[in-house]
Amino acid sequence: MLFQGFNVVINATTQGVPKIVESLFPNLPNFIAHLLATIILVIVLTKLVYKPYKQMIEKQTQKITEVLSDAIEKQTQANIKIKQANTLLEDAKTESVSILKTARIDAEIQKNKIIDNANLQAKNIQSYAQNSIKQEKIKAQLEIKNTIVNLAINSAEKILNKEIDKNTNKQLIEEFIKELD
């Protein structure tokens, strides 16, 4: 009835316009039933399809967020480990340079010790040789002196043809040689 009254109002105001309202709402009870069925269908579909779909999307979003945060954390840890490795590498390089310098210094010290030791041994050998030469020279001088004394005694004996006491003669000759020196 309401619909008929509505129809009358529309028809009375617009006369030449086709009956649009009648074609849109041919039967009001059918329209209300369709409207209620559509609302119920939307509610049922919302509960059966939309909410599980929304929950699934939220779970996927949460998984993606977890994976991204885990990836960021792992990337951060990897960057920290790379920095630590670089620091360790730099420390190793510095230590190797230090070890090389120390080894060179130690080698130089050992070289100098060996050279000093060799020089000392050479000086000792040279000193020993000089002492040996001096001793041999003294020996040779004594031998020459003794030979000269013996020659002088023999010569004097031959000249004088008589034998003088050998000790006295020897003393005379030694005094003569000392005077020559």
UniProtKB/Swiss-Prot annotation:
How does this chain sit within the bilayer? Single-pass membrane protein
Q: Which GO terms describe its molecular function?
A: proton-transporting ATP synthase activity, rotational mechanism; proton-transporting ATPase activity, rotational mechanism
Q: Name one Pfam family in it.
A: ATP-synt_B
One Gene Ontology term, aspect cellular component: proton-transporting ATP synthase complex
Q: Which SUPFAM superfamilies does this entry report, sorted A to Z?
A: F1F0 ATP synthase subunit B, membrane domain
Query: Where would you find the membrane-spanning parts of this chain?
Result: 24-44
At the top level, the lineage of the source is Bacteria
- What are the alphabetically sorted keywords of the record? ATP synthesis, Cell membrane, CF(0), Hydrogen ion transport, Ion transport, Membrane, Transmembrane, Transmembrane helix, Transport
Under the heading CDD domains, the entry gives: ATP-synt_Fo_b
| Cell inner membrane listed as a keyword | no
Q: Where in the cell is it found?
A: Cell membrane
What family classification does the UniProt entry report for this protein? Belongs to the ATPase B chain family.
Q: Which HAMAP family match?
A: ATP_synth_b_bprime
Q: What does this protein do?
A: F(1)F(0) ATP synthase produces ATP from ADP in the presence of a proton or sodium gradient. F-type ATPases consist of two structural domains, F(1) containing the extramembraneous catalytic core and F(0) containing the membrane proton channel, linked together by a central stalk and a peripheral stalk. During catalysis, ATP synthesis in the catalytic domain of F(1) is coupled via a rotary mechanism of the central stalk subunits to proton translocation.
Q: Can you state the subunit structure given in the record?
A: F-type ATPases have 2 components, F(1) - the catalytic core - and F(0) - the membrane proton channel. F(1) has five subunits: alpha(3), beta(3), gamma(1), delta(1), epsilon(1). F(0) has three main subunits: a(1), b(2) and c(10-14). The alpha and beta chains form an alternating ring which encloses part of the gamma chain. F(1) is attached to F(0) by a central stalk formed by the gamma and epsilon chains, while a peripheral stalk is formed by the delta and b chains.
Question: What protein am I looking at?
Answer: ATP synthase subunit b
Q: Which gene encodes it?
A: atpF
